[in-house]
């Protein structure tokens, strides 16, 4: 479970990550990473639009992504990071394992984990 202190909730934080952060994409996801000078722990947020599917599909996709992200928090820098995971339409039909592979690939492309790290 992704604890409250690690959840990204405010519009301004999403904007910083989406507009000013580095970006890495896969077929199903786009990851946005920004480093802030705040003394907050690294926080993760999700954007799952109607393009992904209906309400049930969107919520299922977000739950899967939240579970994957919670398992990757230990590989991310401890303080000041904002990670936004934006789901593309193909994410709606992806399994949890496929989403995990895409998150790991995006984190490697952003330089946040070493090659081979975070798999699992």
Curated annotation (Swiss-Prot):
GO terms for biological process: tRNA 5'-leader removal. GO terms for molecular function: 3'-tRNA processing endoribonuclease activity; ribonuclease P activity; tRNA binding. Keywords: Endonuclease, Hydrolase, Nuclease, RNA-binding, tRNA processing. It comes from the Bacteria. Its EC number is 3.1.26.5. InterPro entries: Ribosomal_Su5_D2-typ_SF, Ribsml_uS5_D2-typ_fold_subgr, RNase_P. It catalyses: Endonucleolytic cleavage of RNA, removing 5'-extranucleotides from tRNA precursor. It is an enzyme of class 3 (hydrolase). The keyword RNA-binding applies. Pfam families: Ribonuclease_P (PF00825). GO terms for cellular component: ribonuclease P complex. SUPFAM superfamilies: Ribosomal protein S5 domain 2-like (SSF54211). RNaseP catalyzes the removal of the 5'-leader sequence from pre-tRNA to produce the mature 5'-terminus. It can also cleave other RNA substrates such as 4.5S RNA. The protein component plays an auxiliary but essential role in vivo by binding to the 5'-leader sequence and broadening the substrate specificity of the ribozyme. Belongs to the RnpA family. Consists of a catalytic RNA component (M1 or rnpB) and a protein subunit. PANTHER family: RIBONUCLEASE P PROTEIN COMPONENT. This is Ribonuclease P protein component. It comes from Kineococcus radiotolerans (strain ATCC BAA-149 / DSM 14245 / SRS30216). The lineage of its organism: Bacteria, Bacillati, Actinomycetota, Actinomycetes, Kineosporiales.
């Amino acid at each position: 479970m992704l604890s409250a202190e690690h959840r990204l909730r405010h519009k301004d934080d999403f904007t910083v990550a989406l507009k000013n952060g580095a970006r890495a994409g896969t077929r199903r996801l786009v990851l946005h990473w920004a480093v802030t000078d705040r003394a907050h722990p690294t926080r993760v947020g999700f954007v799952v639009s109607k393009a992904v599917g209906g309400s049930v599909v969107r919520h299922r996709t977000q739950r899967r992504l939240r579970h994957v992200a919670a398992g990757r928090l230990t590989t991310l820098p401890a303080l000041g990071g904002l990670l936004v995971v934006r789901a593309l339409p193909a994410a709606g039909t992806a399994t949890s394992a496929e989403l995990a592979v895409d998150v790991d690939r995006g984190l490697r492309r952003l330089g946040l984990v070493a090659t081979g790290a975070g798999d699992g």
